[in-house]
Amino acid sequence: MSEQTLENFDEVNETNAEMDEQISEEPHKDRLIAAIHKEKIMAAIDNPKAKEDIDLLKEALSAYEYWIKSIKSLTTSGIQKVDDMTRLLNGYKDYLEVDLIASKGSDFLKRQKGQLKLDNSVMEEFLIHLVDPSILSNLPGFDLEPGPKTAFMSLAFRPSSISKLNEKPEVVIKDKDQDFTIGKTIHYKFSPDSNFNSRSTLSGKLHLAVLAAECKVNYDKTMFQECAGTAARLKYGCPIAKYFVLVEYLDMQAEDVRMTEIDNVFLLRKAKRLPFEKRSSLAEVRNQHKEHPIHTEVVLKFVNEIQNFINTKWYDPAAAISRGSFI
């Protein structure tokens, strides 16, 4: 790989220092980006069960910092920037998942990397960087809060008796963690009192996700069914919402998502999961990463879905007559 794709990690610390000097003050939007994957590395470092892997995880942390600074230092835009970002993503994932975890990790780390979210959190953080004016046009002037969120699913009123109707409302809000969302925090107040007296007012907030995506390293039939259920619940609470799944390795037969509320499943590596007997082989894992990198073409399909969604007017009942239909 080229230097841009994180090939030479022996000089990561020196390169990090140089890049600190080169990168000027970040735009406000960039400073809001959550270090989702970094948090998982730090949590693993603090995990007593991973004490054999402390040095390895510290190497991963240095590589992470280099990866993020490399993304932020890109001066390209549009398709070229997505291609550059995908190349950097492949470089970092190859180093983390093959050169570090698969090659040097303890049995605990190899078995529990999914549970520790050391692998799929990379993709979660990568997606946040796609929601940027250098890639997407017509973004609004406010923060779309991209990233993992606990997203609103449904709301119901549940008064326990007739006398309770004049008291603080009893409200049941259902929500669910999503790996990636685009949306907005909504603040609410419910009260039988028009002056919103504090004793009879229920207030709170929820995250309204208008676009959500699930990130999976491996994807089987059970996961597909779970995603279908989540998509249906998400759209029950927000009918205009979009729901996607981004998968690295497929572990099932492809199905017609039109039979569900899932808008699409993107196969990032265009690859199936390794057979069970090959998953512990370093050579097989390394070869799979080499032969099946994450494809810019597939990432762009997801970016185009976001762009089309941004450009579309989601609901315009005033135009029903001229359109000739309700929607």
Feature roles, as predicted:
Residues 1-121, 133-147, 151-159, 163-165, ...:
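C-terminal tail/extension regions appended to the core domain(s) of diverse proteins
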Residues 187, 219-220, 250-253:
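Short, catalytically relevant binding-site loops at active-site mouths
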Residues 213-218, 245-249:
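Short His-Asn-centered micro-motif
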Residues 119-127, 223:
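Short amphipathic alpha-helical segments
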Residues 189-194, 218-229, 236:
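Active-site-adjacent loop/helix micro-motif of nuclease/hydrolase catalytic cores
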Residues 180, 209-217, 227:
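Conserved catalytic cores of phosphodiester-cleaving nucleases, focusing on short active-site segments
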Residues 147-203:
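Active-site metal-binding core of divalent-cation-utilizing nuclease and nuclease-like domains
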Residues 105-110, 206-214:
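Glycine-rich, often proline-containing surface loops adjacent to acidic residues and nearby aromatics
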